[in-house]
Amino acid sequence: MPSLGTMCSLLLFSVLWVDLAMAGSSFLSPEHQKLQQRKESKKPPAKLQPRALEGSLGPEDTSQVEEAEDELEIRFNAPFDVGIKLSGPQYHQHGQALGKFLQEVLWEDTNEALADE
């Protein structure tokens, strides 16, 4: 007959093994996936706030920025998606730099396409 130490060791091993098996099965179960999806759907999406031209935006300034009618939105696809939204004053201040950046990016893509041919 096995000794008391052997029996305790086997009992401890089996309890730990069952714990490990239960943890793995709960991870793979559909209920766990449903709970994860519910948790993700409850999180509100992060909303980005544009920066002011001078200083930081206060709560009263954000409504003015959101209601601005003279906004410009630029989107283009490279190996990744990029979106830029500017108000009229921001476009006048940063328009040349943005145009130069876009020309450089698009020019690199054109040069790479020509080199591949």
UniProtKB/Swiss-Prot annotation:
Q: Where is the composition biased (Basic and acidic residues)?
A: 31-43
* Pfam families (alphabetical): Motilin_assoc (PF04643), Motilin_ghrelin (PF04644)
Show the propeptide residue ranges.
52-75, 99-117
Q: What post-translational events are described? A: O-octanoylated by GOAT/MBOAT4. O-octanoylation is essential for ghrelin activity. Amidation of Leu-98 is essential for obestatin activity.
Chief location of this protein within or outside the cell:
secreted
Lipid modification (O-octanoyl serine) maps to 26
PTM Leucine amide: list the residues: 98
Which parts of the sequence are annotated with region: Disordered? 30-68
Residues where lipid is bound covalently (O-hexanoyl serine):
26
GO MF terms listed in the record are:
ghrelin receptor binding; growth hormone-releasing hormone activity; hormone activity; protein tyrosine kinase activator activity
Of which family is this protein a member?
A: Belongs to the motilin family.
The name this protein carries in UniProt is Appetite-regulating hormone
Tell me what organism the protein belongs to: Canis lupus familiaris
Q: What is the lineage of its organism?
A: Eukaryota, Metazoa, Chordata, Craniata, Vertebrata
